[in-house]
Design a protein with these regions (language model features):
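Long helical/loop segments within the catalytic core of UDP-sugar-dependent glycosyltransferases
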Residues: 1-53, 64-67, 85-113
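Basic/Trp-rich segment in TM-proximal cytosolic loops or flexible interdomain/linker regions
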Residues: 23-25, 81-159
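Active-site micro-motifs of SAM-dependent methyltransferase domains
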Residues: 43-44, 59, 80
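Short active-site alpha-helical segment characteristic of glycosyltransferases
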Residues: 59-62, 69
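Catalytic beta-strand/loop signature of glycosyltransferases that borders the donor
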Residues: 69-84
Length: 159
């Protein structure tokens, strides 16, 4: 971590901070990155989808559908350390960071998946729960994409 350029450490801190603050929304947690789940749940969900980029969080939605909306994430409070991309050359490190962020942005693929699958398989899931999960995905990707612009524009308005 400390061998990475400062700009990458700042980005890694921002990501860690965002992740930690999202733990406050217990009802909106989705699996991602390193998670643990039972093999039974993986089988019931139809295994990981190998055709998508962000399969680590898609498995949550597959389980949500397989269990008719009765599936949730329970956070495990374990010590973690920040990590970041790193290369011997500064510019290559920045390119690697961009590639990492681009991969995370692929999570937007969950929005059409949820809309489609809720129509097909989500008959027993209450409408409010379907709406909640589509909104959480949409709001998260929308705010992530626009937060820099919003801060820049609204930050200049008088109080």
């Amino acid at each position: 971590m400390w061998e990475s350029p400062a700009v990458l450490r700042i980005m890694a801190f921002g990501t860690t901070f965002w992740t930690m603050t999202s733990l406050a929304r217990q009802d909106a947690l989705v699996t991602f990155s390193s998670h643990s789940m039972s093999f039974r749940a993986i089988v019931d969900a139809g295994y990981h989808d190998r055709r998508i980029v962000s399969e680590d969080s898609r498995i949550f939605y597959q389980c949500l559908l397989a269990y008719n909306g009765n599936y949730e994430v329970t956070p495990m409070y374990l010590p973690v350390s920040m990590d970041t991309v790193r290369d011997d050359r500064w510019w290559k490190s920045v390119k690697n960071l961009y590639a990492q962020q681009r991969r995370w942005a692929w999570g937007v693929e969950h929005i059409p998946y949820l809309i489609s699958e809720f129509r097909k398989k989500g008959k027993l899931i209450p409408f409010w729960k379907k709406f909640k999960w589509v909104f959480i995905e949409w709001e998260g990707k929308w705010s992530w994409a626009l937060v820099a612009l919003i801060i820049t524009i609204l930050g200049r308005l008088p109080m």
